Amino acid sequence: MNNTEYYERLGVDKNASQDEIKKAYRKMSKKYHPDLNKEEGAEDKYKEVQEAYETLSDEQKRAAYDQYGEAGRNGGFGGGGFGGASGFSGFGGRSGGFGGFEDIFSSFFGGGGAQVNPNAPRQGDDLQYRINLKFEEAIFGVEKQVKYNREELCHTCGGSGAKAGTHPETCHKCGGRGQINVVRDTPLGRMQTQTTCDVCHGTGKEIKEKSTTCHGSGHEKVAHTVKVTVPAGVETGQKMRLQGQGDAGVNGGPYGDLYVVFQVEASDKFERDGAEIYYKMPMDFVQAALGDEVEVPTVHGNVKLKIPAGTQTGANFRLKGKGAPKLRGSGNGDQYVIINIVTPKNMNQAQKEALQAFAKASGIEVSGSGQKGFFDKFK
């Protein structure tokens, strides 16, 4: 099991912080970006860097990878995705998803840890909601109204689960403990174990007359709306925590939290890597040969760029401060303009004659038969 390869790809150790991982990712991503590095194998390296960062930038995926290696990333070791077409899902309880030795021993001996008071206040479950953002919305920030269903305290009983005018009583069978002792035959002999009370189902309370609204649960599903202020510069996969916007707590406990996860749509014009933006600019070979001043689109509007004579395909120019806002820190990243020289396909007679004259003056023989020659110099 190799659980260090992803760290090696980014050039960090296993104890690296998220800021160190992100900084290393930016460096390696720029080093192997296909538009900036034309060496053989650079694109594969770039994909490997993306794969490593996708896992190590997510705390749940990273924890699974640290423990199980590649199997933890691909297998069912928790760290679920988004729920449903609405982009909403719950995180479930706060007890975690893994069983351990305590679970094994408790199946025989009934316990193995401190007893939990069933009447103690407990925080409600956290929820997760995915927000789809347009490319420009992620760049500049936006306000979104998020509507989802969550568990709130029953408006009839106020969370007690009992019919109006009545109150829950201490369970007569378990005495309010939520568990009862049971004698069982096990492979180790006859053992006394503890199990969840079959009367109160672990709550320690009996409700003689249940609320007709929540049927004794104390909660009801309610459509809830919250305003989300999306900060400028967010990226796909980043999360935003909204405290107290999750499910209602139990026994007077606080509400859980809502985690908003951002999904940014791709642009048909730009590529983005953190705060850096890349734009492939098609350019006529005459402009590239003679030099020109051109208008370049950016997310901040068009800007003028001087192209020096003799510019080749793959040349890149930096437009300082024309990238995305830096989510941590101040200012913007840069935009990189990558030149893609276009050879004309359909030329009129005057254009052909002009190029033939240029070829002759350059000492280049052009057969016109489609063989490699003059035009290949501009590809």
Curated annotation (Swiss-Prot):
Zinc fingers classed as CR-type: ranges: 141-223
User: Record's SMART domains?
Assistant: DnaJ
Q: Which Gene3D superfamilies match?
A: DnaJ domain (1.10.287.110), Heat shock protein DnaJ, cysteine-rich domain (2.10.230.10), Urease metallochaperone UreE, N-terminal domain (2.60.260.20)
Pfam families documented for this protein: DnaJ, DnaJ_C, DnaJ_CXXCXGXG
CXXCXGXG motif repeats span: 154-161, 171-178, 197-204, 211-218
Which keywords does UniProt give here? Answer: Chaperone, Cytoplasm, DNA replication, Metal-binding, Repeat, Stress response, Zinc, Zinc-finger
Question: What task does this protein carry out?
Answer: Participates actively in the response to hyperosmotic and heat shock by preventing the aggregation of stress-denatured proteins and by disaggregating proteins, also in an autonomous, DnaK-independent fashion. Unfolded proteins bind initially to DnaJ; upon interaction with the DnaJ-bound protein, DnaK hydrolyzes its bound ATP, resulting in the formation of a stable complex. GrpE releases ADP from DnaK; ATP binding to DnaK triggers the release of the substrate protein, thus completing the reaction cycle.
| Domain comment quoted from the record | The J domain is necessary and sufficient to stimulate DnaK ATPase activity. Zinc center 1 plays an important role in the autonomous, DnaK-independent chaperone activity of DnaJ. Zinc center 2 is essential for interaction with DnaK and for DnaJ activity.
- State the similarity comment: Belongs to the DnaJ family.
This protein is called: Chaperone protein DnaJ
Lineage of the source organism?
Answer: Bacteria, Bacillati, Bacillota, Bacilli, Lactobacillales
